[in-house]
Each structure stands twice: as C-alpha cells, then as structure tokens.
A protein has these predicted regions:
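The feature captures the beta-strand-to-loop junction immediately N-terminal to the Walker
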Residues: 44-46
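Helix-to-loop junction immediately C-terminal to a conserved catalytic motif
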Residues: 59
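ABC transporter nucleotide-binding domain
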Residues: 178-270
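Conserved ABC ATPase "signature" region
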Residues: 107, 111, 116-131
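Catalytic Walker B motif of ABC-type/P-loop ATPase nucleotide-binding domains
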Residues: 160-164
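Conserved ABC transporter NBD signature motif
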Residues: 67-78, 83
C-alpha cells in the first residue's frame, strides 16, 4: 500500500526578520518523512522544534522553499477541492469561529462534504453535548480541542492531521481522544500528529520522527527508538548495605547517592554501563554488599533527551 503522505528534503524559510537585519530564517532543514494508512505517525519535539510548520507544509497551508510534498499523490499547495475533501485537519489553536456554538458549527462543517462523517456519533463520543449551548469563545481549552477534533473528522477523511491533540484535556477526555485515535487507525486512516508530550507519543505512535531545531534527528518505531546499544543499561536505582563509616566517592552529577538509614544507601540515576561498572568496581574495593537493583525499561523521553543533548553538543 502506498504512503498517504511523503515529504522529501523539505525546506522552509520565514522572514524577513527585522531583528536580524531583514534576513530570512531557515526553520526546516531538509525534513523527510512518510506516513502510511492504518498508522499513527508522530512528529515529536519540543515547542518551537518545527513540528507545526512541517504539518502546515504537509497540508499545503504554507508553501515550502524547497523539497517535495505529496499528499494522497498530489501536491497539497493549491490542492483541488477533491483532495481537500479527503483530508481532516485539527489545528493547535483550534481555528474555530468564536461566536458559534459547537453543534451548529459541526453540522455546518459536515455540510461541505459529499460523504460526511457520523456527526451525532462524534458529538456523543467526545462529550460535546455537555457544553452544546455554550459559544466557542466561552469553552475551556480542552472543550475546544474536542470540538476541533470532531470538526477534523466531519468529512470522513482518509488522512487526519492532529496538531497537539491532547493539549488542555483532562485525564478522562484525554483517554476518550486516545481511544478514538486508536479506532481511527484500526479503521485504516492515516493519522499524522504532533506532540511535545513523550507519554502521548509512546502510547499512540506506530512510527515516530524526532524533530529538533528544524532537523529530523531520529526516527523509528517506539520499540526501535527505545532499544539500546550495549553501552546503555536500564537501571533506575540501586540500594546497598555498607559500613556506616563508608566514605562516599566523587560521582557524576547525574548520580545521586544518599544514606537512607545507617549503613543503607540508595543510588539514583544510573544510566550507562560505565556508571554501573564504576559502581561495581567501588563495591568490590570496599567489600560492599548490594541489596537490590530496581530496573525499568527505557522510555521515549529518555531517548529524546539523549538525542537532543547530543545534537546540542554537535552544534
């Protein structure tokens, strides 16, 4: 099956910027990605990394300065109404008319499509009836997010772009949105979302592109990204017994050693095999008896922080 979205070597400049003597600023540096039907493809990165700009170029909302974008086989910039009808978009700020109420708005949006989605089902599923009589301007951020998601699905799209879909949601609404996204993926939709929340990316994604400062610095499935080279270890904490007169060694800043009770110590922050080797060597020299090792799997947040830190050092 062909990818629904293919981006190759995407470049984007903004400007001219008065603070930079009228120069242009490059914000996307050769981004390449693809998104498949029946998958959630996530652009993960900090605020300002270039995720939303990439999404805007992918939708054809802004022109690129280089590279190519193919959305359902077409160039999305200046796309035909036929292509637009196959794509749903949820913007980070909602983009909703403030004076309208949610349900009339959703029915109005659905009226533009030949194959509208199940608006009543979306209203029920996303709990929009709870605030149906309130104008958009008076809704909370999370309520606006739910309306924006329903609007993105109003045309029964094949591809859905979701920019920070869980922003402002309470835990219950967040779970409802996550469940809906998973069902849409299982139904064969291509879902492309952005997030700066590592937990969201880890829970939802089939494939992740990590974006940092306009560069695609890593990509893969969550399992691939969290898999480790042999130099890494998933130790989270170590507790051990020793003499109360133990002289503590100098440790790297990321390691935190404390005496919880006399003769009983806890070390937090062990990250690498080198950390663990230094620790075991010290135990051997001091005849220290380890008591317990607490292990945890690597998370996407660990991977993101390490990759971003390496990128910053490289720059």
């Amino acid at each position: 099956m062909s990818p629904s979205l293919v981006i190759e070597d995407l470049l984007k400049d903004f400007g001219p910027v008065p603070a930079l003597d009228g120069r242009m600023v490059r914000v996307l540096h050769g981004i390449s990605l693809k998104a498949e039907p029946g998958n959630v493809t996530t652009l993960l990165g900090a605020n300002g990394a270039g995720k939303s700009t990439t999404l805007a170029c992918a939708q054809g909302l802004v022109p690129a300065n280089g590279g190519t974008v193919r959305l359902l086989g077409e160039d999305p910039y200046g796309a035909s109404p036929a292509l637009r009808s196959r794509v749903g978009v949820m913007l980070q700020d909602g983009g909703l008319p403030p004076s309208m109420r949610p349900i009339p708005l959703l029915r109005h949006v659905a009226s533009f499509f030949q194959r509208p989605g199940d608006i009543d089902g979306l209203i029920e599923r996303l709990g929009i009836n709870e605030f149906a009589t309130t104008s958009i301007r008076r809704l909370s951020g999370g309520q606006k997010q739910r309306v924006a998601l329903a609007a993105a699905l109003a045309g029964n799209p094949e591809v859905v772009f979701l920019d920070e879909p869980s922003a402002g949601l309470d835990p219950q609404s967040r779970q409802v949105v996550f469940d809906l996204i998973n069902e849409l993926r299982d139904a064969g939709l291509c879902i492309v979302l952005t997030t700066h929340l590592m937990e969201d990316a880890q829970r939802l994604s089939d494939y992740v592109y990590i974006i940092n400062d306009g560069h695609n610095i890593a990509q893969g499935t969550v399992a691939e990204l969290t898999a480790h080279a042999a130099t890494e270890t998933p130790v989270q904490a170590v507790t051990f017994n020793a003499a109360t007169s133990l002289v503590l060694p100098a440790l790297p800043e990321h390691l935190h050693l404390a005496e919880s009770t006399p003769g009983h110590y806890r070390l937090d922050g062990v990250r690498t095999a080198a950390d663990l080797a230094a620790l075991t060597g010290w135990w051997s020299r001091e005849d220290i008896l380890p008591h317990a090792l607490t292990m945890q799997p690597r998370t996407l947040e660990d991977v993101f922080l390490e990759i971003a830190e390496k990128g910053n050092h490289a720059n």
